[in-house]
A protein has these predicted regions:
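Amphipathic C-terminal alpha-helical segment
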Residues: 139, 155-176, 191-193
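Generic hydrophobic, amphipathic alpha-helix propensity
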Residues: 13-25, 42, 67-71, 75
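Helix-turn-helix
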Residues: 20, 28-62, 66
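N-terminal intrinsically disordered/low-complexity leader segments
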Residues: 1-15
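Amphipathic alpha-helical packing segments from all-alpha helical-bundle domains
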Residues: 98, 102, 106-109, 120-156, ...
Length: 193
């Protein structure tokens, strides 16, 4: 008697296989960078055949898109909820800085590979991050700028101070703690206001 076909089970197995490949790729991108990771590396890490990786992701663009989304879904949450209970401008700025530093620490394994940042899929994610950061800056500064009209220079300088590269350069010094980095950035932003 022929075995019955279960399309739901098949679909589940396909999704699990795809997820396994994405997770292997995300880990390799953190270890080696996007441009140094081959489909052969991915197949070995995922414990699948190389053609299986190509079948699931015929082009690197689709794989990179899946990986950036996978990593982004697990990133620390950046929402206006971080300001709950924060009444002073300094408290709000400190909450924003703390959140941004957590995000930078989370994404550092991938972003440290500078050449990878020129890829369209990564650029798209970074643009989304800038938009989100701008929203949070506006929310943080709301007590000081009730109209929501923050001076352009203040917004630009705040974006610069909250940028991954600022965090990474301070982190690279190695002699200051995460808490000190957060204090430095918070103080710098508060002096601009």
């Amino acid at each position: 008697m022929p075995r019955s076909y279960n399309s739901e089970k098949r679909k589940q197995l396909e999704n699990e296989l795809r997820q396994k490949i994405v997770e292997a790729t995300v880990a390799l991108h953190a270890e080696k960078g996007v441009t140094s990771t081959s489909y052969q590396d991915i197949a070995k890490r995922a414990d699948v055949a190389i053609p299986t990786v190509y079948k699931k992701f015929p082009d690197a663009s689709g794989l990179l898109y899946a990986c950036t989304r996978h990593a982004a879904m697990r990133a620390p949450v950046q929402s206006e909820e971080i300001f709950t209970g924060k009444t002073s401008l300094r408290q709000r700025v400190a909450a924003l800085v703390h959140t941004r530093c957590k995000v930078h620490a989370y994404f550092n394994p991938w972003l440290k590979w500078g050449g990878d940042r020129v890829m369209p899929e990564v650029i798209s994610l970074l643009k989304e991050d800038i938009t989100q950061t701008k929203r949070l800056i506006l929310a943080a500064f709301a007590p000081a700028y009730a109209t929501g009209k923050i001076p352009k220079e203040l917004l630009s300088m705040s974006l610069l101070l909250l940028n991954y590269h600022t965090w990474a350069s301070l982190q690279a010094q190695g002699k200051i703690t995460q808490k000190q980095i957060e204090m430095y950035i918070t103080n710098s932003i508060c002096k601009l206001i």
